[in-house]
Amino acid sequence: MPRLFTLGGLALRLDGAGGAHAPPQTKRLVLLAYLRLAAPDQLVRRDSLLALFWPELGDAAAHNALRQALHYLRRRVGCEAFVGQGAAAVGLAAGALWCDAAAVEEAVIQARWAEAAAAYGGGFLAGVHVADAAPELEEWVARTRERLRNAAVEASSRAADEASAAGDLVEAVRLAGQAEQLAPDRDDVARRFVAALSRAGRGGDAAQAYEAFAARLARDYGAAPAAETRALLASLRLTDDGRGAAELPPISAAAMPGSTALAGPGLDDRPPADAVPGTLAGADSQATRIARIARIARIARIARIARIA
């Protein structure tokens, strides 16, 4: 079965895992991705495709460009992969084309968290530019990219929970860190990463991860970590063997299937930076910040002593 790769770039592999790649034809491969992801197992009206992919061309030239694109794709994917309704609509037959983006979403739906986390290879159509396309196509790409990123964050977070429950604390840290890389500004993701580091006996790294998160929010959004995130750091206590007792926090509603926040920007509901003139929105007082920094330093020192011991 041909395989379409859309995460971290764009490529069509013709004969399965070991087959040759099709020559690069960006707009035509994005058209294939659109048929596979925007309307899976459904037909798309040809006039809609013309408006999305060739808005600058006249009617005759646009129809000709679509015919050539479909001819190119049929030669590589197979005529049997395409279904249609005369000259009015076209689509892909069910199961005719494997796509990495679809594989991620299907794994998430089926709660195969580790598989979904491993399958996410980067941003949807990262670095791909479709020349002379309609703004609506660019908006679809952006929405799909955000949806898949959120799916990968959820998958990595839940896979981290599974690894932690199984006692694989190293893998839990890796997966929680993967989620943190994808959503570096989300409080719930930061809490999970800090807690995973603490449970793995890396209290100093947990404190540093929190400090880096707080610095990002202050720098980029003029905001401070949520009270729950600050409370997690304050609650971290190290046992004699250096292992943190913090539990992995629950995933926020922003990462839950079916949540209206799933396709959101990935930030908690924080006030804008200019909500309080002359101050950082939601920031602590100077005394509170000094106390928090001192607490972080104490945790880091305890962790270093525990590791030496």
Language-model region placement:
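Intrinsically disordered, charged and Pro/Gly-enriched terminal/linker segments
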Residues: 2, 19-30, 34-42, 48, ...
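N-terminal flanking helix/linker immediately upstream of nucleotide/cofactor-binding cores
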Residues: 281-283, 309
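Short, Lys/Arg-enriched N-terminal segment that forms or immediately precedes the first helix
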Residues: 7-20
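Long, intrinsically disordered low-complexity tandem-repeat segments
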Residues: 290-308
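Conserved catalytic core of two-component sensor histidine kinases
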Residues: 67
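C-terminal flanking helix
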Residues: 70, 74-81, 214
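Long, compositionally biased low-complexity repeat segments characteristic
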Residues: 254-256, 284-294
